[in-house]
Amino acid sequence: MNNIIETNKLCKTFSNGGVQVHVLKNIDLEIREGDFTIIMGASGAGKSTLLYALSGMDKPTLGEVKFAGVDITKMNTDELALFRRDNCGFVFQQVYLVDSMSVLDNVLAAGLLTNKDKKAVTEKAKEILASVDITKELWDKFPTQISGGEAQRVGIARALINSPKLVFADEPTGALNSHTGKDVLDALTKFNEAGQSIVMVTHDITSARRGNRILYVKDGEIAGECDLGQYVAGDQDRHRRLKDFLGEMGW
């Protein structure tokens, strides 16, 4: 299996009142194509900072991030924006849809950024919306007329409309109840099973069980890694192995 991301001595430092805070410390890691990679860790450990560095949303202070063989740390702001548009999909805890546009048009607008064939993009948008259980009856509604879980699934459809090499998800179920959160996780899992590479930050063990590879961040470093790929999804041994691993990490 090929690596879609490789980092070398990745560091991120912030200045806080004149004091240098080292949030990421010499991180070397690989993200494999087709994996559902989970990033876990305590609050403030550097999980989201790592996600943003991997995706090019935030430049590291030092080190390399090679995305599909290209070192994105050497790109300027405009180059990074185009690279993210063409290669990345993003799903955040708070989904931002355009309230003045219909559900379908929110997804369509993202697709038209890279493909000007409106008819083809419209058909693809409808297919993806249907695949995340956003039914035809909702396509003409506005974001204010749908539930939080439905809005998050629209966000997933929007993230996938341009067939990204990698989807980055930052606490996508954090603002949802367990039922609607499960629907969102089901949607992400469905696309991963079809071959979509995903990296997701979460603090929730139920969400983490969806991944086949767990990276645990502690004090800005990768403290440990757990491979769940050998276990069947939903199997108690999978859950037990994850709990044991998190216990070893002091979670």
Functional labels for PLM-detected ranges:
Residues 55:
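Helix-to-loop junction immediately C-terminal to a conserved catalytic motif
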Residues 70-71, 108, 119-137:
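Conserved ABC ATPase "signature" region
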Residues 101-110:
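Short coil-to-helix segment of the ABC ATPase nucleotide-binding domain corresponding to the Q-loop/switch region
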Residues 142-146, 150-152:
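Conserved ABC ATPase signature
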